[in-house]
């Protein structure tokens, strides 16, 4: 598990939020499970494109960047299972070989899929909901 330097400060993209927490980046499910078992307070962090203090903590910030890509897909249902740390800018490229695509996407594509889902990222169009509305399950 990668652990960021203790003196490193995490900041959101606008610089309006910051945190001096220990940032951890597990690469295996077992590391993630161990982290959850041994820490009472964990905040997930991605690209930091939220203005709200969602990631503000003095304890542990969890970065899921190593959990990326498509795990499984169902061509008939045009559904796929995607890992939480997948960045939106990679998701389109990942979906192309399986003839799938996002029906709608926000202007900014730096977010992780988990971040886009949890912060209400949306695209344009009166009839198109935010990305979270397309989630079938976790």
Residue ranges: model-predicted function:
Residues 116-138:
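FAD-binding subdomain of flavoenzyme oxidoreductases
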Residues 3-12:
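N-terminal regions that are enriched for targeting/export leaders
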Residues 9, 18-20, 134:
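Short loop/turn motifs at secondary-structure junctions
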């Amino acid at each position: 598990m990668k652990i960021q330097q203790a003196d490193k400060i995490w900041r959101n993209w606008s610089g309006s939020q910051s945190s001096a927490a220990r940032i951890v980046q597990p690469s295996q499910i077992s590391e993630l499970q161990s982290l959850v078992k041994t820490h009472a307070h964990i905040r997930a962090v991605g690209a930091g494109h939220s203005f709200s203090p969602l990631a503000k903590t003095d304890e542990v910030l969890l970065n899921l960047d190593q959990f990326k890509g498509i795990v499984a897909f169902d061509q008939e249902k045009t559904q796929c299972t995607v890992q939480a740390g997948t960045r939106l800018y990679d998701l389109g490229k990942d979906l192309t070989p399986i003839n799938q695509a996002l029906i709608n996407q926000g202007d900014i594509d730096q977010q992780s899929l988990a971040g886009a889902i949890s912060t209400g990222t949306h695209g344009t169009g009166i009839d198109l909901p935010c990305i979270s509305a397309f989630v079938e399950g976790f």
